[in-house]
Amino acid sequence: MKELKHLMYFERLLDDAHNELVRQAEAEGDLAIGYTCFHAPEVLLNLGSCFSVRLRAPHTTSMELATYYMANNSCEFSRAILERALEGGYGFLHAMAGVDVCEANNRAIENMEIMHAQGADKDKFFYCNLDIPYSDDEDCVEHICEQVSRKILKPMRENYGVDTSDAAIRAAVSEHNEVCRILTEIGETRKLDNPPITGYEYAVLVLVSYVCPKRLILPLLRETLAEVKTREVDAQKNYRVRVAVVGSEIDDPDLIRLIESCGALVVADRYCYGSFPGRQEIVLTDGEDALTQVCRWYLQHTECPRQSALHRVQYRNDHVAQLVHDFKADGAIYEQMKFCTYWSYERVIANQVMPRDYGIHILSIDRPYIAGQSGQLRTRVQAFVESLEMKQLRAAQKEDN
């Protein structure tokens, strides 16, 4: 297929957290608020002149300093983020929205605050650490509303004069929903037998929507949607099998590129920094305040294995099965960041439950933060592709008989 018009520009935006569009927005007077986790409600970080930047540490080579302050058996994602912060890579931020979800990420942001990683002369800068409930009932919704109001909206309003009213929240939701509609429409094309977009390209599109100001990335996403609608696909399919990828943080699209180079087209992205969850519309009604509805939406749509209530576990398993069915995947790859506590449990359980209860063939892996060039991972994915092909062959032979 012909390369997407803006793909190379999008890739350049992913080379640095302080990318060109972030710099442009700040030059125009906007305020960047950093976050890492789905549980820090993204849409509430985009009120008024504020815009969210989901933190990444592209091109990480060493984590020695972060390992000194944390531990060599702590999550590599968290260590990479702390390392980049200590290098001064996030000095452009005006606030940092943390969450008390996983210990490693919590410790990373705590160290940022202790060592003043935000830089000097930032009296208005604030850190927050939201206490996230383990379930999604109305008591939990009330709790997270109080946390967000006190720890995010109040300092935004008092430190920077940001409008945090109900009308401002609804305006932010409207802009957020347009991003979601565009990415959903593009993503739906992956259900086709010969999609007009690859998993790698889609991962790049989703990532830039997380790390760039919405108002500046939206025109480029609109153009890309129009381009995908009319894109001519290759006559021959360029994949051998279709897979869903499920798991923890994938903020490096080169991992998706590696999987696809083995012949497995990634048709569903159910991982942190992917489109499931995070790129679905938030539907608001007029009968309740917007803040409560937004907080409820994030609690009810999280797919983090920290949510240990039984109905949440069932929800996650059912959703993966639904994605595999809807996107016509031949199997699923469950991946976890090395040393991730919650996903280590989820991945092991899924290794038993998904084949047994749902008939879904899976590959279960743990991986380093930078995995795009991993020879061992490539070998395992290649073997998985071959096993899926053998499964298809046996099924075809059974039908013939």
Show which residues each predicted segment covers.
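Metallocofactor- and cofactor-centric catalytic cores in central/energy metabolism, strongly enriched
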Residues: R12-V22, E26, G34-V43, S62-A66, ...
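Glycine-rich, highly charged phosphate/nucleotide-binding loops
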Residues: Y69-E87, S308-V320
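Acidic/His-rich segments in extracytoplasmic proteins that coordinate ligands and/or metal ions
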Residues: A80-P155
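TerminUS-proximal long segments
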Residues: N317-V324, A329-G331, E335-T341, E346-N401
